[in-house]
């Protein structure tokens, strides 16, 4: 029986081969399968990866697909008791990560999704990894910088816990502790297949960004828990696939889509007002300090 299926999306080999190499030594003794979704790479990176790592399965896409759509292709054929979505711009440095995280999930049967600590390229400092569902108060606190005020995020759990001044949820210290969250990032998204089958696959209407939030929402709605486990860590080189301008616009638009699908209709116009308010604040701020960034926010305002 396959214990672990790993789904990786890639369109270039810059990080992929080092990711696959780092997996080899950590999967010894675990019945596993690696499913690589070649996202319409011009140099057919999947074919090259298959030659170097013959044990992997390759799904070739002829057109560029979104994060959720591509992962769904791998998730549909995954046979493992656990299914891991892993970014190709990651490196596995903990040799026992899979043995021990799977054991932890076996000991915690209510957990449907778990993630580990994500290290920056210095292999010391931690990145943010997920947070709490984007309710109106949380989005307001995020878009107006209110959650940067020390103590505020003790009252309002943040949508994006980030580095900041607050001693509670914001700052690297938060990501050093084991805790339950509403959602975790897709860079390392370990699912119990039983829970995945119940919650469903990614909603392919979300091309990029917020898709993990939406899927996590369905996991929790189905009664499963989501945990962040920084005892185990990987390196995430991050932001390799999408520039900041597209990322920003995708996230704001997909927050609106999330509200259309899951929240009461009266909340959407309030969300849109909050998003536009936050964007205007950034246009003013960066207009004084960094005009090129301000131009990005002007485009974002028009997009929402």
Regions found by a protein language model. Give the residues of each.
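Glycine-rich, basic loop-to-helix element that forms the pyrophosphate-binding segment
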Residues: 61-78, 100
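Conserved donor NDP-sugar-binding/catalytic core segment of glycosyltransferases
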Residues: 94-129
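Active-site-adjacent helix/loop segment of glycosyltransferases
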Residues: 119, 216-293
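A conserved acidic beta->alpha catalytic loop
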Residues: 22, 38-47, 63, 91
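Short, well-formed alpha-helical segments that are part of the catalytic scaffolds
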Residues: 12-27
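Short, flexible, basic/aromatic active-site loop/helix in glycosyltransferases
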Residues: 134-181
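A short, conserved alpha-helix in the catalytic core of glycosyltransferases
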Residues: 173-233
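Short aromatic/hydrophobic "clamp" motif used to bind/position activated sugar donors
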Residues: 83
